[in-house]
A protein has these predicted regions:
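Conserved N-terminal glycine-rich FAD pyrophosphate-binding loop of Rossmann-like flavoproteins
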Residues: 188, 422-442, 548-559
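Rossmann-like NAD(P)H-binding beta-loop-alpha module
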Residues: 397-410, 512-536
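Residue-level detector of alpha-helix initiation sites
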Residues: 305, 398-400, 423, 485, ...
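Glycine-rich FAD pyrophosphate-binding loop
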Residues: 413-427, 536-547
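Flavin-dependent oxidoreductase catalytic cores
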Residues: 1-395, 399, 403-415, 511
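A conserved FAD-binding loop/helix module that cradles the flavin
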Residues: 527, 546-556, 627-650
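A Rossmann-like FAD-binding core segment of flavoenzymes
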Residues: 441-487, 493-513, 533-616
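Internal hydrophobic alpha-helix adjacent to the cofactor/substrate pocket in enzyme cavities
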Residues: 332, 337-338, 527-541, 639-650
Length: 650
């Protein structure tokens, strides 16, 4: 058949293997590793899902080659323990049986290795080593790595590569970027040595990387592909530039089979290496394109890639030979398969909310805001089919209701979804005009398409009442009635100057030049960014001590940076008391009044669950399930998870 994206779907030979297309699953750590650093069946299932989804290669992440000095967290796979062989072998097999190449990342944390985590290696707590002695901002003392230890680590990379080849992996991935050990040696900001590994020349700073690659090549033999990740730029004072990276790449090129160009260092803002929703798609591709002009080895790019049209252009124009994706393949593990089949309208696009990365930090688990399967890949295989099809009525067309309807219909039930308004989307309707939320609003259209494909009957402008339920006589009633915006009990909320935060997407709502937002929660802060990007003068007023407190640990610092960058004025511990024709009157902790002039006051102080509507329907059907904001106002993550499992439980 004629492919819609012929370049993206074309094979590529690297070393003695062939990628079946140009879309590769980049390293993503799965936390379900044993305390001894062994791969579990749950972890193998995590990687297998991407192989089933059509990725050309799937990279198992963060295998540490030197346990005493290299661990940066507690969930590394320990390649110095042959006990990991069985788990690695099963992981490789689970990837390869679906036609993907099994790849594995070899890493060492260098000065950012966690000494407390490495204590389990036995003996006294080891010292942290880097290229040069220094004191980190947190007070940690770093010692210069002695040459004997350098030789030991170089040898460990080779031994680790030999072990994973024995386990059946098709290729290896050397992590030489993002501020880890190899990067530290190449960086003039951290390498101040005066020996042959020292800072005086690019060749000396690259020596460790080249010796590691040579050690791996000696261990795995000719033809076995070596992929090497480097950062195209560091983005830190005194760090290396793209010109230095090009020289580094020219030294590496003849020794490797695929050069993976990322960006950033450990010291950067998290958003540099992991692009946020505020970044352009493909924001790092220019670095790969610049390096590719100077090397003969195939080059892979990465960085907020999930649009097939853009990825096709990258390959067709010669900017890169391979596109790699991480979070995009959490949101939709079947993205490559959908591209191959020309079904790109069905792709669920990553919203770059950082939930996956924040949850790993917070609870050491893996979830995805918009894909309830993530973290449950293994157990999801054993979902029992329903004993008999049931008649299901879903009341509410927000995300929780839609995914409940899709899931139930895909399991064979007869499903009708009724939405009171003229449009699906629920709480997500308010984000459709926000440029950095377009992928989140796209989820509404995707769920609608999934419902139609699954045979869900969709009725708009249809309220679910007791009488309607009696007429329909469903076996199961799913209540997804949503929430309503809270309107504070202050004078002026009915003024033409006042706009509810949920109303920003309405075409008839005009927003003036000077805007005051009452409410500094996540929605209020994101509204402030949106309006400031449109050139509005924005002041954000919050009665509590901090703003955006419900944002996750990865998202919040970046959101605060955006507010500062856009010159949004933030006033905390400030309470709005009345809206006037001129703006918003507030009081501080001492009761002193402050006035903020505004053409428009956006009221964004939260949502209230529609509990009264729920109570009237609790006994309307034999089985009644509640999901989404009508239970309590919640993030899209919780709404989708509850809705998905409600559909699964029927």
């Amino acid at each position: 058949m004629k492919r819609k994206y012929p370049n993206l779907c074309s094979p590529l030979k690297i070393g003695n293997v062939t990628l079946r297309n140009r879309m590769v699953s980049a390293p993503m750590a799965f936390p379900d590793i044993t305390a001894e650093g062994h791969v579990t069946k749950e972890a193998a299932a995590f990687y297998e899902l991407r192989a089933r989804g059509g990725a050309a290669a799937v990279t198992l992440s963060e295998c540490v080659v030197h346990i005493k000095t290299g661990m940066s967290h507690s969930r590394h796979i320990n390649l110095q323990d042959e006990g990991v062989l069985a788990g690695l072998t099963e992981a490789a097999r689970s990837i390869k049986r679906h036609g993907a190449l099994a790849n594995v990342e070899l890493s060492h944390g260098g000065k950012y290795a966690g000494v407390d985590l490495a204590k389990k290696a036995g003996g006294p707590a080891p010292v942290r080593y880097g290229p040069s002695p220094e004191t980190l901002p947190n007070g940690s003392k770093i010692e210069e790595m002695p040459k004997a230890l350098i030789r030991e680590i170089v040898e460990a990379f080779g031994k680790g590569a030999a072990l994973v080849k024995r386990a059946g992996f098709d290729m290896v991935f050397v992590h030489g970027g993002h501020g880890w050990l190899i990067h530290q040696f190449f960086s003039p900001a951290s390498n101040r040595r005066m020996d042959e590994y020292g800072c005086d020349t690019v060749e000396n700073r690259a020596r460790l990387a080249l010796e590691i690659v040579d050690s791996i090549r000696a261990a795995v033999g000719p033809g076995f592909p070596i992929e090497f990740r480097m950062s195209g730029e560091e983005h830190i004072p005194g760090g290396y530039t793209i010109e230095d990276a090009i020289r580094f790449a020219k030294l590496l090129g003849p020794k490797i089979d695929l050069l993976h160009v990322s960006t950033g260092a450990f010291e950067n803002s998290f958003a540099i290496t992991h692009p946020s929703m505020f970044a352009e798609r493909g924001c790092h591709v220019h670095l790969a394109a610049a390096i590719k002009k100077h090397v003969k080895v195939p080059v892979a790019c990465i960085g907020a890639l999930n649009e097939p049209e853009q990825m096709e252009e990258i390959i067709a124009s010669g900017k890169a030979d391979v596109v790699e994706m991480a979070r995009a393949l959490l949101a939709d593990p079947f993205l490559p398969r959908k591209v191959m089949l020309g079904q790109d309208d069905d792709i669920v696009r990553c919203i770059r909310c950082y939930t996956c990365l924040a949850e790993r930090t917070h609870t050491q688990t893996r979830i995805c805001s918009i894909n309830p399967i993530i973290g449950r890949e293994y157990e999801s295989r054993f979902a029992l089919p329903p004993s008999e099809p049931k008649k299901v009525l879903v009341a509410g067309g927000g995300p929780a209701g839609m995914i409940a309807a899709v899931t139930a219909a895909q399991r064979g039930h007869r499903v009708t979804l009724c939405e009171k308004s003229a449009e699906l989307g629920g709480a997500l309707k308010c984000v459709k005009v926000i440029s950095f939320k377009k992928d989140l609003y796209g989820l509404v259209k995707n769920l609608e398409a999934q419902m139609r494909k699954a045979g869900v009957e969709i009725r708009l402008n249809t309220e679910v009442t007791q009488e309607r339920v009696e007429r329909e006589a469903p076996d199961v009633l799913v209540l997804a009635l949503g929430a309503a915006p809270i309107v504070p009990s202050i004078p002026g909320t009915d003024s033409p100057k006042a706009v509810l935060g949920t109303g920003l997407s309405e075409p008839e709502v005009a927003i003036g030049k000077k805007v005051v937002i009452l409410g500094g929660g996540l929605v209020g802060c994101e509204s402030a960014v949106h309006l400031a990007q449109q050139g509005k003068e924005v002041t954000l007023v919050e009665m509590m001590e901090d703003i955006a407190v419900e944002a996750n640990v990865r998202q919040r610092p970046i959101l605060l940076d955006m507010l500062a960058e856009l010159h949004v004025k933030v006033k905390t511990r400030t309470k709005g008391v009345r809206i006037t024709d001129q703006g918003l009157v507030c009081t501080d902790d001492s009761g002193n009044e402050t006035f903020f002039e505004a053409d428009t006051v956006v009221v964004s102080v939260g949502q209230r669950a529609l509990r009264e509507a729920v109570k009237g329907l609790l006994d309307a059907a034999p089985e009644v399930v509640q999901v989404g904001d009508c239970v309590k106002p919640q993030k899209v993550t919780e709404a989708l998870y509850r809705g998905y499992h409600a559909g699964l439980d029927i």
